[in-house]
Amino acid sequence: MANYFNTLNLRQQLAQLGKCRFMARDEFADEAGYLKGKKVVIVGCGAQGLNQGLNMRDSGLDVAYALRKEAIAEKRASWRKATENGFKVGTYEELIPQADLVVNLTPDKQHSAVVKAVQPLMKEGAALGYSHGFNIVEVGEQVRKDITVVMVAPKCPGTEVREEYKRGFGVPTLIAVHPENDPKGEGMAIAKAWAAATGGHRAGVLEFSFVAEVKSDLMGEQTILCGMLQAGSLLCFDKLVSEGTDAAYAEKLIQFGWETITEALKQGGITLMMDRLSNPAKLRAYALSEQLKEIMAPLFQKHMDDIISGAFSSGMMADWANDDVKLLNWREETGRTAFENAPQFEGKISEQEYFDHGVLMIAMVKAGVELAFETMVDSGIIEESAYYESLHELPLIANTIARKRLYEMNVVISDTAEYGNYLFANAAVPLLKEKFMDSLQAGDLGKSIPGSAVDNAQLRDVNEAIRNHPIEAVGHKLRGYMTDMKRIAVAG
């Protein structure tokens, strides 16, 4: 198998990278109807597998779980989760031949083995579904030509897919049909029904290509969504403690600070996040973010280049073949960091204090979001896609850190995201230590910036620069489709 993207000519690559269409609400008038009366079999019962299955069942679909024989015999976690939630569970041989739609929600590294096992069992004309296109695009999986291949990719961790559905809403979702596998022309109908069954149609659905989803998803999770939060957490904690801040206070400011800050980002973009600061603090955060963008732009560009070329995927798949030695070592190193092992702070930090004492963190968020967005757009990815992969998902990832620090984030995200996160953070931390952290001033982190006179013209220009960034325009439009967004922050 060869990397699918690299088999395309330049025109085809650009066309698939740039495929992105916001779908009208009336396109989902039938909701999940196209799949009602058909059998949906999910392979894998992790965070996405279980929570998508629960939503689909609540939407009236016939859902069962196909697990490996040994997982059933040994009553592993996947078997327990499926059975405890009242789902029918069976082996591949028992359930796959009956399925109209087989949804592969196992980890990326297992996809090839799963497809090899289920494909001979699938009936003619059935459909195969993914929630991430890595196996199709980067591995280059070849699927039988009578099988329809579709993707429904909720833009958040699996736990939030369920929580937003239970709130009566949903999460923004990308859907796609693999152009090499749509023999009956029903791929889009299947994908739309599946997306509606998870609740995604209530928050907005984008019609994508497999290529656009994979390349933008990898870039977002490696840089701003996970890598920047990990690097920022470690750098900010160490900086605070080195300057005499109580370790417990420093830990809480960072652990819950990302979530509180990005809640404003979720509701009103970078503009609202920056408006939560005093005018002197806003000017300082803007200046810091511009410095960060200049320093980190080459790192963001390198990650995008390696994603586009396939170099990132090749390196990660080599680690898969080597029993995840790099991934496991990086995971262990993260667990040993001072931030992860700091004591808990029992006092209360007010919501505004997270902003006032977190100017550097706000600058990191602004710089990371804008850089990820700009780098993706410069590479041919459409602005709407870049928005979802750089800004929209950030509060959801920050929420995982608020639960159990970096450990929780890395447990919830996929192994692919975790690997890319470490790759980015391991480069960003020394880079910023060398070129940035020693230049910080009093009030940038852990204390409020003192009140001072503000130049009106400078403030006007900064406000205009913030509001006129392209991500703010596209964000305003897309948030208009998400009028039922619920607050998720739990900080206190």
From Swiss-Prot:
Xref: Gene3D superfamilies: N-(1-d-carboxylethyl)-l-norvaline Dehydrogenase, domain 2, NAD(P)-binding Rossmann-like Domain
Residues that hold substrate according to the record: S414
One Gene Ontology cellular component: cytosol
Biological or metabolic pathway of the protein: Amino-acid biosynthesis; L-isoleucine biosynthesis; L-isoleucine from 2-oxobutanoate: step 2/4; Amino-acid biosynthesis; L-valine biosynthesis; L-valine from pyruvate: step 2/4
Residues covered by the KARI C-terminal knotted domain: 209-344, 345-485
Metal-binding as UniProt keyword: yes
Protein name in UniProt: Ketol-acid reductoisomerase (NADP(+))
Organism of provenance: Yersinia pestis
Gene this protein is translated from: ilvC
